[in-house]
């Protein structure tokens, strides 16, 4: 009896194994390989490759033969062997661009423009630790004459926006578009996206995702074709979508140009390099890229976890791929589509972002363990807007409290910009110091007169910093600031302690945004053909004035060390423009409007409610309407976001006893 049971289970096990080998259970699993030193991450591998002996030698794609030459690039080169980090003073990446030999091409000019005025630029080769070579490639793939001080390519980066590999590179790193896997050196070379010729230099268009959830019934599927066109069908179609030898009818389909890619859920992209131009189209459209056995390196795969935004599939298993796409959970689809939009906006929407991402990866290699962690690269706002020089702890940034489960801080530092002393300044100090959340007060003395010998007695430390005449210096990251939260004020600001307390409590719920009392709004002026802005009381707003606003101190670091010098110069030349510039910066990071809280009394820069107001109101400072247009041109787009919401305390102006209200002074005239 026991022998019969053993025989039965042995036969059942053999039958089950036979079913698996014959493909009766077609769904395959994909897992991530363990991290290997010097290898790019984010590539799944298929567990059942050994079971598909008939596909072990895949046929060569004739389209790839002429595009994948095997080029000697110094295959033994690694980061430690071929790059001298000792030349980077203070471990800060500075680059010098060799002048292109011959006429400057359009691609070279766009690269040079993206680096102009950036924090990476150096004036001479002696000040740089990385020399940038922009090859003038011909049809044969030759780089042209090598620059002086080539030194075998050591500490050089050969950068090309197009997939045209060069020869005679020696120890130089190569950053090119869609490099083939057989010549790419992981951990040393860099993979760029294939950019169209009309790709914007700065800013760039936002993502085009219109519908987060797939259409009910059938999920739309787009298949990349030649010349940037797409075939549209559904996941219920046959498996002949990408099989060149299939003679069956692939089912109903429509063809669209890449510019009008509809709101498809999945975009099937063949593995040959001629299809790489479709990758960014899918990313911008919010269409999940399904890469069919790609033979090219995904862009920035060294730092971007593409498993959160794309699917790597085996083109030899069409039935299994379609079945897996049909069975994907809606929550997984939503997460993938949201990640495509973040990656597009953070790293790929402009030439400037692509070039700066390339350099930031090299900067991370120089820093080593002090560089950007994976969370910064793969979650908003992205590594380009999260500077590790600010802090090595994620808790010190305003963006990651939700992921880390930490709090933004329980106290603030008041920073008061003083152009002239007066009674209003002394009263403001007393009101701010009376807040239970105030930790310190810093006076930025900008007056030609000497500061007073005596200041009001306060329960918190008061520090005076002299000699800062530039308006942009009010946003300098002073080492005296001891808290993560800043209350930015002017000497003419008039706030009560209750107003300060309530605004700070609101900021604690929105630590990445600005919370202010006085607002402004931008608008498009059809008559002038440009942007305009106004301050005062309107039905919507997109800015808060920094004369009375809470924000995270990280924005001082970003303002000083990330913004191009040309933009800060605009603010210094036009003092009323500094508020606009700070709001541009925060809106670029958050993609959200600021928060407005109630303000109970008139401010010198605010517009009076009506002409019958009995209180004398000083003339508002004239606004330079050209400022906002110059800033929009510098950013490459208009980042400001409008809002019609103001946050008030509970019971604010409700017909109840004032004794029941927590912030009573907010309603006092």
UniProtKB/Swiss-Prot annotation:
Region entry Disordered, spans: 601-621
Superkingdom per UniProt: Eukaryota
Secretion signal span: none
InterPro entries for the chain: Exostosin, Exostosin_GT47, GT64_dom, Nucleotide-diphossugar_trans
Disulfide bonding pattern of the chain: 577-627
Reaction(s) this enzyme catalyzes, per UniProt: 3-O-{[(1->4)-beta-D-GlcA-(1->4)-alpha-D-GlcNAc](n)-(1->4)-beta-D-GlcA-(1->3)-beta-D-Gal-(1->3)-beta-D-Gal-(1->4)-beta-D-Xyl}-L-seryl-[protein] + UDP-N-acetyl-alpha-D-glucosamine = 3-O-{alpha-D-GlcNAc-[(1->4)-beta-D-GlcA-(1->4)-alpha-D-GlcNAc](n)-(1->4)-beta-D-GlcA-(1->3)-beta-D-Gal-(1->3)-beta-D-Gal-(1->4)-beta-D-Xyl}-L-seryl-[protein] + UDP + H(+)
Lumenal side: 30-669
Record-given protein name: Exostosin-like 1
Organism taxonomic ancestry: Eukaryota, Metazoa, Chordata, Craniata, Vertebrata
């Amino acid at each position: 009896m026991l022998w019969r049971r053993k025989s039965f289970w042995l036969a059942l096990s053999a039958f089950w194994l036979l079913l698996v080998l014959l493909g009766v259970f077609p769904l395959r699993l994909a897992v991530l390989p363990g991290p290997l030193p010097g290898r790019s991450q984010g590539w799944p591998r298929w567990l059942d490759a050994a079971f598909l002996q008939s596909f072990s030698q895949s046929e060569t794609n004739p389209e790839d033969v002429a595009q994948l030459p095997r080029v000697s690039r110094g295959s033994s080169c690694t980061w430690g062997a071929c790059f001298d980090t000792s030349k980077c003073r203070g471990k800060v990446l500075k680059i010098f661009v060799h002048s292109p030999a011959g006429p400057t091409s359009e691609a070279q000019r766009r690269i040079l423009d993206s680096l102009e005025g950036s924090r990476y630029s150096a004036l001479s080769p002696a000040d740089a630790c990385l020399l940038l070579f922009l090859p003038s490639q011909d049809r044969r793939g030759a780089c042209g004459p090598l620059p002086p001080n080539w030194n075998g390519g050591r500490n050089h980066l050969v950068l090309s926006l197009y997939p045209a590999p060069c020869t005679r590179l020696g120890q130089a790193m190569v950053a090119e578009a869609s490099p083939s896997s057989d010549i790419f050196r992981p951990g040393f070379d860099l993979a760029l996206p294939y950019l169209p010729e009309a790709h914007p230099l700065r800013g760039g268009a936002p993502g085009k995702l219109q519908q987060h959830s797939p259409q009910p019934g059938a999920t739309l599927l787009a298949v990349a074709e030649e010349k940037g066109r797409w075939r549209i069908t559904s996941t219920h179609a046959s498996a002949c979508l990408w099989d060149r030898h299939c003679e069956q009818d692939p089912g109903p389909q429509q063809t669209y140009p890449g510019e009008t890619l509809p709101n498809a859920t999945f975009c099937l992209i063949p593995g040959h390099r001629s299809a790489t131009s479709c990758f960014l189209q899918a990313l911008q459209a919010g269409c999940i890229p399904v890469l069919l056995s790609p033979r090219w390196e995904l862009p920035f795969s060294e730092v971007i976890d593409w498993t959160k935004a794309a699917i790597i599939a085996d083109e030899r298993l069409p039935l299994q791929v379609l079945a897996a796409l049909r069975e994907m959970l809606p929550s997984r689809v939503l997460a993938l589509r949201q990640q495509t939009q973040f990656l597009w906006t953070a790293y790929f929407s402009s030439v400037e972002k692509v070039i700066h991402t390339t350099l930031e990866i090299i900067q991370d290699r120089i820093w080593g363990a002090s560089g950007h962690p994976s969370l910064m690269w793969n979650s908003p706002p992205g590594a380009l807007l999260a500077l590790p020089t600010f802090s090595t702890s994620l808790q010190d940034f305003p963006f990651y409290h939700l992921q880390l489960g930490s709090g933004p801080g329980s106290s603030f530092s008041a920073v008061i910009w003083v152009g002239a002393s007066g009674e209003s300044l002394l009263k403001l100090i007393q009101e701010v110091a009376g807040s239970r959340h105030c930790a310190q007060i810093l006076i930025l003395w900008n007056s030609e007169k000497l500061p007073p010998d005596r200041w009001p007695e306060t329960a918190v430390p008061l520090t005076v910093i002299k000699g800062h005449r530039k308006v942009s210096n009010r946003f300098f990251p002073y080492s005296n600031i001891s808290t993560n939260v800043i209350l930015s004020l002017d000497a003419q600001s008039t706030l009560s302690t209750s107003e300060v307390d309530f605004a700070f409590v609101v900021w604690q719920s929105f630590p990445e945004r600005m919370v202010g009392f006085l607002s402004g709004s931008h608008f498009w002026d059809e008559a002038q053909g440009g942007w305009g802005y106004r301050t005062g009381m309107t039905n919507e707003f997109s800015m808060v004035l920094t004369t009375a606003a809470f924000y995270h101190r990280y924005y001082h670091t970003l303002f000083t060390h990330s913004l191009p010098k040309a933009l800060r110069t605009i603010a210094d030349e036009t003092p009323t423009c500094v508020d606009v510039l700070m709001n541009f910066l925060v809106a670029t990071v958050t993609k959200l409007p600021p928060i407005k809280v109630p303000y109970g009394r008139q401010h010198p820069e605010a517009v009076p409610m009506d002409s019958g107001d009995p209180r004398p109101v000083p003339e508002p400072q004239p606004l330079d309407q050209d400022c906002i247009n110059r800033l929009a041109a510098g950013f490459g787009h208009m980042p400001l976001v409008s809002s019609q919401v103001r946050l008030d305390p509970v019971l604010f102006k409700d017909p109840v006893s004032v004794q029941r209200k927590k912030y009573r002074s907010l309603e006092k005239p």
